[in-house]
Amino acid sequence: MKTFSAKPADVTHEWFVIDATDKVLGRVASEVALRLRGKHKAIYTPHVDTGDFIVIINAAQLRVTGAKALDKMYYRHSGYPGGITATNFRDMQAKHPGRALEKAVKGMLPKGPLGYAMIKKLKVYGGAEHPHTAQQPKVLDI
């Protein structure tokens, strides 16, 4: 019997919505990364994008455990000498709700063209409203 390999034309991408209110950052991110890759499906093939679209609402209410709200740091560099900037989780959530979740999920996905296509299927919104009601996303409870 031949090994099954999914074809991109045969894959159907479903839409799911996740309410992130009072959910822990890492637990949501790991489940989202798994579903973006498509590893929850029986037709999973590593070199084909078999994942689903994920819409996350209320990302501003995500939480972290312990003292990580102040201790967890995000770094970026301007490219100039001495141009490193550090931001903690609390400030990141206040300024850009959901960006911490996007960075966490992106770090869990493969690097390269396939991983870049997977991260485009993630839609994160800080509030309860999202513009994807036409896709009729199913509620996914984590």
UniProtKB/Swiss-Prot annotation:
Keyword Cell membrane: no
Entry's Gene Ontology BP terms: negative regulation of translation; translation
Keywords: Ribonucleoprotein, Ribosomal protein
GO CC annotation, single: cytosolic large ribosomal subunit
Iron is among the record's keywords: no
Any one Gene Ontology molecular-function term assigned to this protein's record: mRNA binding
Pfam families: Ribosomal_L13
Subunit structure comment from the entry: Part of the 50S ribosomal subunit.
Family under the similarity heading: Belongs to the universal ribosomal protein uL13 family.
Function: This protein is one of the early assembly proteins of the 50S ribosomal subunit, although it is not seen to bind rRNA by itself. It is important during the early stages of 50S assembly.
Protein name in the entry: Large ribosomal subunit protein uL13
Organism of origin: Polaromonas sp. (strain JS666 / ATCC BAA-500)
Gene: rplM
